[in-house]
Protein backbone atom coordinates (compact mmCIF):
# COMPACT_ATOMS: atom_id res chain seq x y z
CA UNK A 1 0.00 0.00 0.00
CA UNK A 2 3.01 2.30 -0.33
CA UNK A 3 1.44 4.44 -3.04
CA UNK A 4 -1.79 4.94 -1.11
CA UNK A 5 0.09 5.74 2.09
CA UNK A 6 2.19 8.28 0.24
CA UNK A 7 -0.99 9.81 -1.13
CA UNK A 8 -2.46 10.14 2.37
CA UNK A 9 0.67 11.89 3.65
CA UNK A 10 0.79 14.17 0.62
CA UNK A 11 -2.84 15.24 0.95
CA UNK A 12 -2.45 15.88 4.69
CA UNK A 13 0.58 18.08 3.99
CA UNK A 14 -1.33 19.85 1.23
CA UNK A 15 -4.00 20.78 3.79
CA UNK A 16 -1.26 22.36 5.90
CA UNK A 17 -0.02 24.31 2.91
CA UNK A 18 -3.47 25.68 2.13
CA UNK A 19 -4.16 26.65 5.73
CA UNK A 20 -0.84 28.47 6.16
CA UNK A 21 -0.73 30.28 2.81
CA UNK A 22 -0.62 33.97 3.82
CA UNK A 23 -1.44 35.14 0.30
CA UNK A 24 -5.01 33.84 0.50
CA UNK A 25 -8.00 35.00 2.57
CA UNK A 26 -8.83 32.76 5.51
CA UNK A 27 -12.15 31.73 4.00
CA UNK A 28 -10.49 30.50 0.82
CA UNK A 29 -7.82 28.65 2.77
CA UNK A 30 -10.45 26.99 4.93
CA UNK A 31 -12.62 25.99 1.96
CA UNK A 32 -9.71 24.46 0.04
CA UNK A 33 -8.58 22.55 3.12
CA UNK A 34 -12.12 21.30 3.75
CA UNK A 35 -12.30 20.00 0.18
CA UNK A 36 -9.26 17.80 0.78
CA UNK A 37 -10.61 16.70 4.17
CA UNK A 38 -13.84 15.67 2.45
CA UNK A 39 -11.89 13.62 -0.09
CA UNK A 40 -9.97 11.80 2.64
CA UNK A 41 -13.04 11.15 4.78
CA UNK A 42 -14.80 9.96 1.63
CA UNK A 43 -12.15 7.26 1.36
CA UNK A 44 -12.83 6.29 4.97
CA UNK A 45 -16.55 5.97 4.17
CA UNK A 46 -15.95 3.72 1.16
CA UNK A 47 -17.45 0.25 1.70
CA UNK A 48 -14.95 -2.57 2.15
CA UNK A 49 -16.39 -6.10 1.96
CA UNK A 50 -13.63 -7.78 3.97
CA UNK A 51 -14.42 -5.52 6.94
CA UNK A 52 -17.22 -7.86 7.94
CA UNK A 53 -14.69 -10.70 8.14
CA UNK A 54 -12.31 -8.79 10.41
CA UNK A 55 -12.53 -11.09 13.41
CA UNK A 56 -12.17 -14.18 11.24
CA UNK A 57 -9.20 -12.78 9.32
CA UNK A 58 -7.41 -11.64 12.48
CA UNK A 59 -7.34 -15.24 13.72
CA UNK A 60 -4.21 -17.35 13.34
CA UNK A 61 -5.84 -19.97 11.17
CA UNK A 62 -8.63 -20.09 8.66
CA UNK A 63 -11.88 -21.52 10.00
CA UNK A 64 -13.19 -24.66 8.42
CA UNK A 65 -15.06 -23.95 5.22
CA UNK A 66 -13.65 -20.42 4.73
CA UNK A 67 -14.63 -19.11 1.31
CA UNK A 68 -11.75 -17.43 -0.47
CA UNK A 69 -7.98 -17.26 -0.07
CA UNK A 70 -7.50 -16.78 3.68
CA UNK A 71 -3.85 -15.66 3.52
CA UNK A 72 -4.47 -13.23 0.68
CA UNK A 73 -7.55 -11.80 2.41
CA UNK A 74 -5.57 -11.38 5.64
CA UNK A 75 -2.92 -9.38 3.83
CA UNK A 76 -5.50 -7.27 2.00
CA UNK A 77 -7.31 -6.49 5.24
CA UNK A 78 -4.10 -5.49 7.03
CA UNK A 79 -3.13 -3.18 4.19
CA UNK A 80 -6.54 -1.52 4.14
CA UNK A 81 -6.48 -1.11 7.91
CA UNK A 82 -3.05 0.50 7.71
CA UNK A 83 -4.04 2.99 5.03
CA UNK A 84 -7.30 4.05 6.66
CA UNK A 85 -5.84 4.28 10.15
CA UNK A 86 -2.98 6.37 8.76
CA UNK A 87 -5.52 8.96 7.61
CA UNK A 88 -6.89 9.17 11.17
CA UNK A 89 -3.37 9.37 12.60
CA UNK A 90 -2.42 12.25 10.30
CA UNK A 91 -5.56 14.11 11.34
CA UNK A 92 -4.89 13.30 14.99
CA UNK A 93 -1.27 14.48 14.94
CA UNK A 94 -2.30 17.90 13.73
CA UNK A 95 -5.37 18.21 15.93
CA UNK A 96 -3.31 17.25 18.97
CA UNK A 97 -0.78 19.96 18.16
CA UNK A 98 -3.55 22.54 17.92
CA UNK A 99 -5.25 21.38 21.12
CA UNK A 100 -2.12 21.18 23.23
CA UNK A 101 -0.54 24.48 22.15
CA UNK A 102 -3.09 26.52 20.22
CA UNK A 103 -1.54 29.91 20.84
CA UNK A 104 2.15 29.42 21.39
CA UNK A 105 4.99 28.83 18.97
CA UNK A 106 8.03 28.22 21.12
CA UNK A 107 9.99 26.25 18.57
CA UNK A 108 9.02 22.85 19.92
CA UNK A 109 7.47 21.86 16.59
CA UNK A 110 10.11 23.32 14.30
CA UNK A 111 10.56 19.92 12.69
CA UNK A 112 7.01 20.10 11.33
CA UNK A 113 7.01 21.77 7.92
CA UNK A 114 4.75 23.50 7.15
CA UNK A 115 3.59 24.63 10.61
CA UNK A 116 0.27 23.45 12.02
CA UNK A 117 -2.50 26.00 11.60
CA UNK A 118 -5.04 26.52 14.39
CA UNK A 119 -7.68 26.53 11.64
CA UNK A 120 -7.54 22.72 11.77
CA UNK A 121 -9.94 23.09 14.70
CA UNK A 122 -12.53 24.68 12.39
CA UNK A 123 -12.66 21.78 9.95
CA UNK A 124 -15.38 19.13 9.83
CA UNK A 125 -14.73 15.41 9.67
CA UNK A 126 -17.60 13.38 8.24
CA UNK A 127 -17.25 9.64 8.84
CA UNK A 128 -21.00 9.07 8.74
CA UNK A 129 -21.96 5.57 7.63
CA UNK A 130 -18.32 4.48 7.40
CA UNK A 131 -17.19 0.90 7.99
CA UNK A 132 -14.61 1.08 10.78
CA UNK A 133 -12.54 -2.07 11.24
CA UNK A 134 -9.37 -0.91 13.00
CA UNK A 135 -8.49 0.54 16.43
CA UNK A 136 -8.53 4.32 16.98
CA UNK A 137 -7.29 4.44 20.56
CA UNK A 138 -5.55 7.49 22.02
CA UNK A 139 -6.22 9.63 18.96
CA UNK A 140 -7.52 13.20 18.76
CA UNK A 141 -10.76 13.99 16.96
CA UNK A 142 -12.38 17.30 16.06
CA UNK A 143 -16.00 17.87 14.99
CA UNK A 144 -16.22 14.16 14.21
CA UNK A 145 -19.40 12.68 12.79
CA UNK A 146 -19.63 8.88 13.10
CA UNK A 147 -23.42 8.81 12.75
CA UNK A 148 -24.66 5.48 11.35
CA UNK A 149 -21.11 4.13 11.15
CA UNK A 150 -20.65 0.38 11.57
CA UNK A 151 -17.79 -0.88 13.71
CA UNK A 152 -16.64 -4.37 12.76
CA UNK A 153 -14.67 -6.20 15.40
CA UNK A 154 -13.63 -4.44 18.63
CA UNK A 155 -14.13 -0.67 18.47
CA UNK A 156 -11.27 0.80 20.45
CA UNK A 157 -11.44 4.51 21.31
CA UNK A 158 -9.79 4.10 24.71
CA UNK A 159 -7.92 7.21 25.80
CA UNK A 160 -9.17 9.16 22.78
CA UNK A 161 -9.93 12.89 22.96
CA UNK A 162 -12.91 14.39 21.18
CA UNK A 163 -13.08 18.16 20.63
CA UNK A 164 -16.09 19.87 19.10
CA UNK A 165 -19.52 18.31 18.72
CA UNK A 166 -19.26 14.56 18.22
CA UNK A 167 -21.92 12.19 16.92
CA UNK A 168 -22.19 8.42 17.13
CA UNK A 169 -25.95 8.54 16.63
CA UNK A 170 -27.39 5.30 15.22
CA UNK A 171 -23.90 3.80 15.07
CA UNK A 172 -23.69 0.01 15.11
CA UNK A 173 -21.04 -1.60 17.30
CA UNK A 174 -21.05 -5.24 16.20
CA UNK A 175 -18.95 -6.46 19.12
CA UNK A 176 -17.13 -4.95 22.12
CA UNK A 177 -16.55 -1.19 22.21
CA UNK A 178 -14.12 0.62 24.49
CA UNK A 179 -14.21 4.31 25.33
CA UNK A 180 -12.31 3.70 28.56
CA UNK A 181 -10.73 6.95 29.74
CA UNK A 182 -11.98 8.85 26.69
CA UNK A 183 -12.37 12.61 27.01
CA UNK A 184 -15.26 14.45 25.36
CA UNK A 185 -14.76 18.21 25.66
CA UNK A 186 -17.99 19.20 23.91
CA UNK A 187 -21.43 17.74 23.16
CA UNK A 188 -21.56 14.08 22.21
CA UNK A 189 -24.52 12.04 21.02
CA UNK A 190 -24.91 8.26 20.94
CA UNK A 191 -28.69 8.31 20.60
CA UNK A 192 -30.20 5.25 18.88
CA UNK A 193 -26.81 3.50 18.74
CA UNK A 194 -26.58 -0.25 19.31
CA UNK A 195 -23.81 -1.93 21.28
CA UNK A 196 -23.96 -5.65 20.48
CA UNK A 197 -21.05 -6.49 22.77
CA UNK A 198 -19.64 -5.02 25.96
CA UNK A 199 -19.66 -1.21 26.12
CA UNK A 200 -16.77 0.17 28.17
CA UNK A 201 -17.01 3.81 29.28
CA UNK A 202 -15.29 3.47 32.65
CA UNK A 203 -13.34 6.57 33.59
CA UNK A 204 -14.65 8.52 30.61
CA UNK A 205 -15.12 12.27 31.06
CA UNK A 206 -17.93 14.21 29.42
CA UNK A 207 -17.35 17.96 29.77
CA UNK A 208 -20.56 18.95 27.98
CA UNK A 209 -23.98 17.38 27.49
CA UNK A 210 -24.00 13.71 26.51
CA UNK A 211 -26.92 11.81 25.03
CA UNK A 212 -27.36 8.04 25.21
CA UNK A 213 -31.12 8.28 24.71
CA UNK A 214 -32.75 5.22 23.13
CA UNK A 215 -29.41 3.38 22.98
CA UNK A 216 -29.53 -0.42 23.16
CA UNK A 217 -26.81 -2.10 25.19
CA UNK A 218 -26.96 -5.82 24.42
CA UNK A 219 -23.75 -6.67 26.25
CA UNK A 220 -22.62 -5.42 29.62
CA UNK A 221 -22.30 -1.65 30.02
CA UNK A 222 -19.58 -0.20 32.25
CA UNK A 223 -19.79 3.49 33.16
CA UNK A 224 -18.01 3.10 36.50
CA UNK A 225 -16.08 6.21 37.55
CA UNK A 226 -17.43 8.13 34.56
CA UNK A 227 -17.79 11.89 35.02
CA UNK A 228 -20.55 13.91 33.37
CA UNK A 229 -19.92 17.63 33.91
CA UNK A 230 -23.20 18.59 32.23
CA UNK A 231 -26.46 16.83 31.36
CA UNK A 232 -26.40 13.05 30.95
CA UNK A 233 -29.37 11.67 29.03
CA UNK A 234 -30.04 7.91 29.03
CA UNK A 235 -33.81 8.23 28.63
CA UNK A 236 -35.55 5.21 27.10
CA UNK A 237 -32.26 3.32 26.80
CA UNK A 238 -32.27 -0.46 27.11
CA UNK A 239 -29.69 -2.40 29.11
CA UNK A 240 -30.08 -6.07 28.25
CA UNK A 241 -27.16 -7.19 30.45
CA UNK A 242 -25.55 -5.86 33.62
CA UNK A 243 -25.03 -2.11 33.87
CA UNK A 244 -22.30 -0.75 36.13
CA UNK A 245 -22.62 2.93 37.05
CA UNK A 246 -20.78 2.64 40.36
CA UNK A 247 -19.05 5.84 41.46
CA UNK A 248 -20.75 7.74 38.66
CA UNK A 249 -20.48 11.53 39.01
CA UNK A 250 -23.00 13.79 37.28
CA UNK A 251 -22.94 17.58 37.62
CA UNK A 252 -25.94 18.29 35.38
CA UNK A 253 -29.38 16.74 35.11
CA UNK A 254 -29.11 12.96 34.80
CA UNK A 255 -32.01 11.27 33.04
CA UNK A 256 -32.62 7.54 33.21
CA UNK A 257 -36.35 7.97 32.68
CA UNK A 258 -38.23 5.03 31.14
CA UNK A 259 -35.06 2.95 30.98
CA UNK A 260 -35.27 -0.85 31.01
CA UNK A 261 -32.61 -2.69 33.01
CA UNK A 262 -32.72 -6.42 32.23
CA UNK A 263 -29.46 -7.09 34.05
CA UNK A 264 -28.21 -6.00 37.44
CA UNK A 265 -28.04 -2.20 37.71
CA UNK A 266 -25.35 -0.88 40.04
CA UNK A 267 -25.15 2.79 41.03
CA UNK A 268 -23.22 2.24 44.25
CA UNK A 269 -21.45 5.30 45.71
CA UNK A 270 -22.56 7.52 42.84
CA UNK A 271 -23.04 11.27 43.13
CA UNK A 272 -25.85 13.12 41.38
CA UNK A 273 -25.27 16.83 41.97
CA UNK A 274 -28.34 17.97 40.05
CA UNK A 275 -31.71 16.36 39.38
CA UNK A 276 -31.79 12.62 38.77
CA UNK A 277 -34.69 11.17 36.78
CA UNK A 278 -35.51 7.47 37.01
CA UNK A 279 -39.26 7.87 36.59
CA UNK A 280 -41.04 4.94 34.91
CA UNK A 281 -37.87 2.89 34.70
CA UNK A 282 -38.04 -0.88 35.10
CA UNK A 283 -35.41 -2.88 36.98
CA UNK A 284 -35.87 -6.57 36.16
CA UNK A 285 -32.82 -7.58 38.18
CA UNK A 286 -31.34 -6.12 41.40
CA UNK A 287 -31.06 -2.35 41.57
CA UNK A 288 -28.27 -1.09 43.82
CA UNK A 289 -27.99 2.57 44.84
CA UNK A 290 -26.31 2.05 48.22
CA UNK A 291 -24.13 4.89 49.56
CA UNK A 292 -25.10 7.24 46.73
CA UNK A 293 -25.80 10.95 47.06
CA UNK A 294 -28.66 12.72 45.32
CA UNK A 295 -27.93 16.45 45.55
CA UNK A 296 -30.90 17.56 43.48
CA UNK A 297 -34.45 16.30 43.20
CA UNK A 298 -34.54 12.51 42.86
CA UNK A 299 -37.44 11.35 40.72
CA UNK A 300 -38.36 7.67 40.98
CA UNK A 301 -42.09 8.07 40.34
CA UNK A 302 -43.60 4.95 38.81
CA UNK A 303 -40.36 3.01 38.96
CA UNK A 304 -40.70 -0.79 39.06
CA UNK A 305 -38.17 -3.02 40.81
CA UNK A 306 -38.82 -6.72 40.23
CA UNK A 307 -35.97 -7.95 42.40
CA UNK A 308 -34.10 -6.41 45.32
CA UNK A 309 -33.88 -2.63 45.50
CA UNK A 310 -30.98 -1.41 47.62
CA UNK A 311 -31.04 2.18 48.85
CA UNK A 312 -29.13 1.62 52.08
CA UNK A 313 -27.20 4.65 53.36
CA UNK A 314 -28.34 6.79 50.46
CA UNK A 315 -28.62 10.50 51.12
CA UNK A 316 -31.34 12.48 49.40
CA UNK A 317 -30.26 16.10 49.91
CA UNK A 318 -33.35 17.46 48.17
CA UNK A 319 -36.85 16.19 47.49
CA UNK A 320 -37.31 12.52 46.65
CA UNK A 321 -40.33 11.35 44.70
CA UNK A 322 -41.18 7.63 44.76
CA UNK A 323 -44.89 8.15 44.15
CA UNK A 324 -46.46 5.17 42.42
CA UNK A 325 -43.26 3.14 42.68
CA UNK A 326 -43.53 -0.63 42.91
CA UNK A 327 -41.13 -2.70 45.00
CA UNK A 328 -41.97 -6.32 44.27
CA UNK A 329 -39.21 -8.01 46.27
CA UNK A 330 -36.85 -7.01 49.04
CA UNK A 331 -36.19 -3.30 49.37
CA UNK A 332 -33.57 -1.85 51.71
CA UNK A 333 -33.66 1.80 52.78
CA UNK A 334 -31.63 1.15 55.93
CA UNK A 335 -29.71 4.25 56.96
CA UNK A 336 -31.19 6.35 54.16
CA UNK A 337 -31.63 10.04 54.91
CA UNK A 338 -34.18 12.30 53.25
CA UNK A 339 -33.17 15.94 53.80
CA UNK A 340 -36.00 17.19 51.60
CA UNK A 341 -39.63 16.19 51.26
CA UNK A 342 -40.07 12.48 50.60
CA UNK A 343 -43.07 11.20 48.69
CA UNK A 344 -44.06 7.53 48.59
CA UNK A 345 -47.74 8.14 47.89
CA UNK A 346 -49.40 5.27 46.01
CA UNK A 347 -46.19 3.25 46.23
CA UNK A 348 -46.50 -0.53 46.55
CA UNK A 349 -44.26 -2.45 48.91
CA UNK A 350 -45.09 -6.06 48.16
CA UNK A 351 -41.87 -7.80 49.15
CA UNK A 352 -42.36 -10.97 51.15
CA UNK A 353 -40.02 -10.62 54.15
CA UNK A 354 -40.71 -8.36 57.09
CA UNK A 355 -39.00 -5.06 56.33
CA UNK A 356 -37.59 -2.60 58.84
CA UNK A 357 -37.50 0.95 57.53
CA UNK A 358 -34.60 2.60 59.37
CA UNK A 359 -34.92 5.91 57.58
CA UNK A 360 -34.43 9.52 58.62
CA UNK A 361 -36.99 12.11 57.50
CA UNK A 362 -36.07 15.65 58.67
CA UNK A 363 -38.75 17.06 56.34
CA UNK A 364 -42.21 15.94 55.31
CA UNK A 365 -42.78 12.29 54.51
CA UNK A 366 -45.81 11.27 52.49
CA UNK A 367 -46.94 7.62 52.39
CA UNK A 368 -50.57 8.40 51.54
CA UNK A 369 -52.30 5.54 49.72
CA UNK A 370 -49.18 3.41 49.89
CA UNK A 371 -49.66 -0.36 50.08
CA UNK A 372 -47.52 -2.59 52.29
CA UNK A 373 -48.17 -6.25 51.49
CA UNK A 374 -45.70 -7.43 54.11
CA UNK A 375 -45.28 -6.47 57.74
CA UNK A 376 -43.67 -3.02 57.73
CA UNK A 377 -41.67 -1.88 60.74
CA UNK A 378 -41.10 1.87 61.08
CA UNK A 379 -40.01 1.66 64.72
CA UNK A 380 -36.47 2.72 63.83
CA UNK A 381 -37.50 5.48 61.43
CA UNK A 382 -37.11 9.12 62.47
CA UNK A 383 -39.84 11.57 61.49
CA UNK A 384 -38.95 15.15 62.43
CA UNK A 385 -41.69 16.95 60.50
CA UNK A 386 -45.12 16.00 59.19
CA UNK A 387 -45.66 12.41 58.14
CA UNK A 388 -48.72 11.13 56.33
CA UNK A 389 -50.07 7.60 55.97
CA UNK A 390 -53.56 8.62 54.84
CA UNK A 391 -55.36 5.59 53.42
CA UNK A 392 -52.17 3.56 53.46
CA UNK A 393 -52.73 -0.18 53.82
CA UNK A 394 -50.65 -2.62 55.85
CA UNK A 395 -50.61 -6.40 55.83
CA UNK A 396 -51.72 -8.16 58.98
CA UNK A 397 -49.70 -10.91 60.59
Language-model-detected regions and their locations in the chain:
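N-terminal leader/targeting and pre-domain segments
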Residues: 5-12, 17-397
Amino acid sequence: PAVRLSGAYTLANLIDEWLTDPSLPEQVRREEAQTIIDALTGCIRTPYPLAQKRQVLEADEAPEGYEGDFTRDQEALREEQLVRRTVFMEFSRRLAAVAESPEKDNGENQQTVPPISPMWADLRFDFGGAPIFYPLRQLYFQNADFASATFYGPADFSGATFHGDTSFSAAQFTTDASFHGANFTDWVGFSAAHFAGAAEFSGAHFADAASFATVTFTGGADFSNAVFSAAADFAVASFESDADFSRLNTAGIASFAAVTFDGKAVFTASTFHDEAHFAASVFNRPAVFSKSLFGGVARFAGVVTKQSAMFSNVRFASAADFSGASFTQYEDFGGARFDGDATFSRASFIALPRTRYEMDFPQRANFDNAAFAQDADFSKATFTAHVGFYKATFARE
